[in-house]
Amino acid sequence: MAHMAATVRVIGSPAYPVSEKLLYQRIEAALQRGSCPEGVARQMVAIAASGERTTLLPSISCPALVIHGAADPLIPVACGIDTAALIPGARLEVIEGMGHDMPPQLIERLLALIDVHLQGKMAPQMRSQPA
């Protein structure tokens, strides 16, 4: 658990720190859902071996919302900007102070962004009607 906590501290959001207690509670909950070190290793190899995919982004035809942390130490914000620019009609939201995580302090904001995106992009007949 200490290694996982250290990783979260490195990639986490500098403007939205979480307490040690909450950090360990979240790690414990994740471990209780399941842990597969071999699966993580396979995923890392797959990421490294997947190669360049930006040429595929212009072929995305569904509405896209790109949310990227301005303080992401793992994937530079320029990559999020490029991703949104390459997807036709994509909307970009750069969150100041956010790293490569979803801090509890931002969950409401992230959910609101996703909700607005989905409500605005769904066909009118698919939206739920008030009772």
Spans of model-derived segments:
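Alpha/beta-hydrolase
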Residues: 1-55, 62
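Hydrophobic/aromatic residue at the end of a short beta strand that borders the catalytic acidic motif
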Residues: 7, 75, 102
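Short, conserved loop/helix-junction motifs that constitute active-site signature segments
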Residues: 58-60, 86-87
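Short beta-strand/loop motif that positions the catalytic acidic residue
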Residues: 60, 66-68, 72
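Conserved alpha/beta-hydrolase "acid-adjacent" motif
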Residues: 73-79
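Catalytic active-site module of serine/aspartate enzymes centered on a nucleophile-bearing elbow/loop
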Residues: 90-131
